[in-house]
């Protein structure tokens, strides 16, 4: 069972809502901007997915071509990109989370303690960006688990520098943990070309971008 080791904290900061002259003209209720988080549970959401080229993983059918193009660009740059995780349905996420809770309780944790600890490793069901079908963990090779200390930093820099060219952003950047609760520099999220360029230029996470339209 593959698991991502995540830095997770209680979110306290509010998204940036200052005004921008170059704000893209988009329908913020569209599928590209769906947020899955503790504040936005998407338990009933089931996207149509297609297989990613060269992988057993799947991705939202409307964005899979963009992901394939990003992966090709990585290969052309000399990397061997590996999809660690892409679409993960609710029931799979629920099983991973409950397995982690049970493991923690066997070690002596109370249910509350076990759930708190489990959330650092596996997002509670309905709160994972992977359920949107628009998020993928991309690394440079297979790892038994993901952490900022083990994944190739040079590849993560390449990913951050190039993903917007294909409509993606880093979903959980290190400088937005106070808003997102996570630090996952390998986790790309499809938001479309215009949003990706804008978010990258202005250093915004998805929560901050969506808040600009509220």
Over which residues does each language-model region extend?
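Extracytoplasmic cell-surface/polysaccharide-interacting catalytic and binding patches
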Residues: 6-214
């Amino acid at each position: 069972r593959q698991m991502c080791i995540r830095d997770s904290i209680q979110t306290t900061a509010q998204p940036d809502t200052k005004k921008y002259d170059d704000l893209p003209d988009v329908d913020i209720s569209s599928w590209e901007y769906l947020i899955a988080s503790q504040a936005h549970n998407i338990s009933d959401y089931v996207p149509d997915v297609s297989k990613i080229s060269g992988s057993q993983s799947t991705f939202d059918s409307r964005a899979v071509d963009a992901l394939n193009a990003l992966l090709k660009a990585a290969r052309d740059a000399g990397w061997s990109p590996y999809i660690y995780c892409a679409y993960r349905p609710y029931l799979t996420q629920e099983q991973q989370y409950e397995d982690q809770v049970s493991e923690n309780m066997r070690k002596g944790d109370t249910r509350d303690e076990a759930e708190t600890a489990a959330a650092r490793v596996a997002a509670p069901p309905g709160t994972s960006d992977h359920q949107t079908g628009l998020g993928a963990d991309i690394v440079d090779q297979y790892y038994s688990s993901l952490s900022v200390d083990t994944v190739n930093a040079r590849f993560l820099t390449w990913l951050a520098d190039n993903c917007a060219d294909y409509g993606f952003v880093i979903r959980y950047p290190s400088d937005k943990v106070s808003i997102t609760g996570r630090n996952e520099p390998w986790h790309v999220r499809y938001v479309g070309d215009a949003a990706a360029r804008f978010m990258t230029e202005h250093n915004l996470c998805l929560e901050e971008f969506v808040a600009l339209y509220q």
